[in-house]
C-alpha cells in the first residue's frame, strides 16, 4: 500500500498522464492471463466507457468475465442475495482497518483482502459477466452452467418483439441432461421486463426459467436468461403468480 500511495501521490500526479496512457500501462502490467475483480457490478462498465471515450480498443469481443467480489461474499457468508458494503465485509471478516476507506487504492486493497478470505469453491465458480460489449452474433452468445443454475446472454436485437421471437431466447433446455423441455407454464411477464416459465424434465424435475430484458446501446435490447431446477414450493409460488397476473388483467379489461 505504501508503494502504491507513493506512486499515486508523486510520480503519476507529477507526470499528469492521461487516462489512455495510464490504462495501457495498467493492462501491460496485468499481462495476458488475468481476470478483473471488483466490489459490485458497475466498475468494468464505467472503465470501458472511459476507454472508448479515449479511443482505446475494447477489453475484448463480447461480455467480459470478472469476479464480483461483493456477490461472492454474499454467496460464501450470507444468503447469496443481500449485497453488503465493503466496510461491512471487512468488519465481518475481522480484517484490520489500517488504511482509510473510500479511496481508490485503499478500497482496492480491502477488496483484495476480502477476496483472499473467500475459500468456498462454489462461490469461486460464480463468475460474472460485464455486458458493455455484447455478443456479436448467435455463435458468440454466452452459455455457462454453474453449480445449480445456467445462464445465457444473447446478442442484441432491434426491439423486444424480435428478442422474444428468437428460438434460443425462448428455449428451455435442461442444463444437466441437455434435453429440450416442454413448457408447463409458457413465458409470461408481470411487467414487460421480466419473463418467467416453468418446464418439466423427466429425469431432473421442475425447471424455472427467467428472462430479463435489458437495454443495449442504439435503442437495442438483449436478454439475460437463467434456468434453475426448483422444488414444489417454488413451482406453486410461480403458478400462483401467473394466476394472479391473469386475474388482474381480466379485471382491467
Could you tell me what each predicted segment is?
Residues 15-253:
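DEDD superfamily 3′-5′ metal-dependent exonuclease/proofreading module
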Residues 1-9, 14:
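Single conserved hydrophobic/aromatic residue that forms the stacking wall/gate
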